[in-house]
Amino acid sequence: MGMTESPQTSFTPYQPKKGETYMGEPQKEHFRQILSAWRDELSAEMERARHRMQDETVNYPDPTDRATQESEMTLELRTRDRERKLIRKIEETLDQIDSGEYGYCESCAAEIGLRRLEARPTATLCIDCKSLAEIRERQMG
């Protein structure tokens, strides 16, 4: 699993206290920390990649070497673009935490659940709605 799919930062799984409210302040803070660390990690990786790309830009005389370098750069730029989009999604998710919308399925309003959110903190659908969406996607081709 790559950095763009879920956070790499290790964290202690959240253990709700008996009778604790779903998405109360302690849970929101738990996910705020996970998402902020993930965003910072992605930003740092993008910065490292930018420096790497600047340092590695060489004007190779051999066309094959140039082609290899260009395809590596294209792949790197695609990865950076995915990371930029993910950072935007993380920012939107942090806004959802602040507005009180976080943790609830945008399709059926059910609780998404702590374990699913820890596995995929930017999830906006509960597992049932996500499964249904994937089935529909496969049927549509």
Could you describe each region identified by the protein language model?
Residues G2-S99, E137-G141:
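Interaction interfaces in information-processing and related assembly proteins
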Residues I97, A109-E111:
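A generic structural signal for ordered secondary structure
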Residues S99-G103, P121:
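Flanking scaffold residues of small Cys/His-coordinated metal-binding clusters
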Residues E106-C108, D128:
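Short, cysteine/histidine-rich loop/knuckle motifs that typically chelate Zn2+
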Residues I112, A133:
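Cys/His-rich microdomains that often coordinate metals
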Residues R115-A119, R136-R138:
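Short Cys/His-rich "knuckle" micro-motifs
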Residues A123-K130:
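Cysteine-rich micro-motifs
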